[in-house]
Curated annotation (Swiss-Prot):
Gene from which this protein is expressed: tyrS
Protein name: Tyrosine--tRNA ligase
UniProt-listed GO biological process terms: tyrosyl-tRNA aminoacylation
Class of enzymatic activity (EC top level): ligase
Organism: Leuconostoc citreum (strain KM20)
EC number assigned by the record: 6.1.1.1
One GO CC annotation: cytosol
Length: 415
């Protein structure tokens, strides 16, 4: 399969301006493609990963990958369909640029990937040059018809955000000129901005100039919910914001209805292996082979091979109940979402400890559960109602992990 056929098979192609022309350009020599991202946060999230996966596929097909960090456009803000964006300070933008640049460098490595900042050219552009050299080439009538602009006409859109499509068009032309970039890749909401850039290139370089655009479908799960969040929280690529274990678990917990689609979209596995995994989902869903492979592949791409091993080792320890040897960081990672309570850093009788922490509703119930072997502290079963709990004995004195029954966990956080 060629690059476009592969995208179609994976369900990763929404619109394309000139399929035959792009394939012809790719066959005639090495051409560049780019994805742009504005530093509106200090980390990328899963929504950003989608166009980067397509760019990586383009690179694997023999193309040159270019990534724009929007140092200039990030100061403006890509218009949203509903409300105006809050402008970020220059200090915050600089900090965000630093974090995102490090992330895309890690994703793409050093193999023929160019990472550029559009402040290098937009930052040098005077207002007069902007209006004279570019403003004259954009029709207000056409700009007003772009989907995101049209959706804001009733509620209002600032001139700042209205001109964003011009700036993105300039980006495409600059990369066309500087880096031999012929293709822009973006989400489905970027179609209008991408075609504006192609029109600008044709206006400046002639209608024969080769410039193409493709967009990716909006990713949703089988229920129609927008993809990329877990219990309402964004899944970040920064390991400090979403740990590799949580990231791994997000993929491992995907349902049978979605996992094959995500294997096509988010991994570089071939059709034969994905077909085999789809067969496993159909014939033996309880084994969850497809989900495990999905978690392994995406975690490896984002965080590296060692992160996969650490996540799987932690999963094994949790499944077996062997939590005594885990580090404080692993405990915080794995049990950050369970009910928690504050605990004093003093030795306390187990019955009092359980009641004071809200693990048990009464001392009678606490004594009964302890005597029946239903309580484990830091991975060790406690059956003596006279036992004393030393909060500083495990996990660097930061936590006490309580399990009631087979699956109910509570995390005591030491004051």
């Amino acid at each position: 399969m060629n690059f476009i056929e592969d995208l179609k098979w994976r369900g990763a192609l929404n619109q394309i301006t000139d399929e035959a022309g792009l394939l012809e350009a790719m066959a005639s020599g090495k051409v560049g493609a780019y994805v742009g991202t504005d530093p509106t946060a200090d980390s990328l999230h899963l929504g950003h990963l989608i166009p980067f996966m397509v760019l990586k596929r383009f690179q694997k097909a023999g193309g040159k990958a270019v990534i724009i960090i929007g140092g200039a456009t990030g100061a403006i803000g890509d218009p949203r369909p509903t409300t105006e964006r809050q402008l970020l300070s220059s200090e915050q933008l600089a900090e965000n640029e630093k974090g995102i640049t490090a992330q895309v460098t890690k994703l793409f490595g050093d193999n023929d990937t160019r990472i550029v900042n559009n402040n290098d050219w937009l930052g040098q552009l005077t207002l007069t040059d902007f209006l004279r050299d570019y403003g004259k080439l954009f029709s207000i009538n056409v700009m007003l018809k772009k989907d995101v602009v049209a959706s804001r006409l009733e509620t209002g859109i600032s001139f700042t955000e209205f001109t964003y499509q011009v700036l993105q068009g300039i980006d495409f032309h600059e990369l066309w000129r500087r880096e031999d970039v012929k293709l822009q890749i973006g989400g489905s909401d970027q179609w209008g901005n991408i075609t504006s850039g192609i029109d600008l290139i044709h206006s400046l370089e002639g209608n024969e100039a080769k410039a193409f655009g493709l967009t990716i479908p909006l990713m949703t799960d089988s229920t129609g919910k927008k993809f990329g969040k877990s219990e309402g929280n964004a899944i970040w690529l920064d390991p400090k914001k979403t740990s590799p274990y949580t990231f791994y678990q997000f993929w491992l917990n995907q349902g049978d209805a979605d996992v094959v689609k995500y294997l096509k979209y988010f991994t570089f596995l071939g059709s034969e292996e994905i077909d085999d995994l789809a067969e496993a989902v159909a014939t033996n869903p309880g084994e969850r082979l497809a989900q495990r492979r999905l978690a392994q592949e995406v975690t490896k791409f984002v965080h590296g091979e060692s992160a996969v091993k650490e996540a799987e080792d932690l999963s094994t320890a949790l499944f077996s109940g062997n939590v005594a040897t885990l580090s404080a960081a692993q405990i915080a990672d794995a049990f950050g979402g369970v009910p928690s309570f504050e605990a004093a850093n003093t030795v306390k009788n187990i019955v009092d400890f359980l009641v004071d922490g809200g693990v048990e509703a009464s001392k009678r119930q606490a004594r009964e559960d302890v005597a029946n072997g239903a309580i484990s502290i830091n991975g060790e079963k406690v059956t003596d109602v006279a036992a004393e709990i030393n909060p500083l004995s495990h996990y660097d004195g930061q936590f006490v992990l309580v399990r009631r029954g087979k699956k109910k966990y509570f995390l005591g956080k030491i004051k």
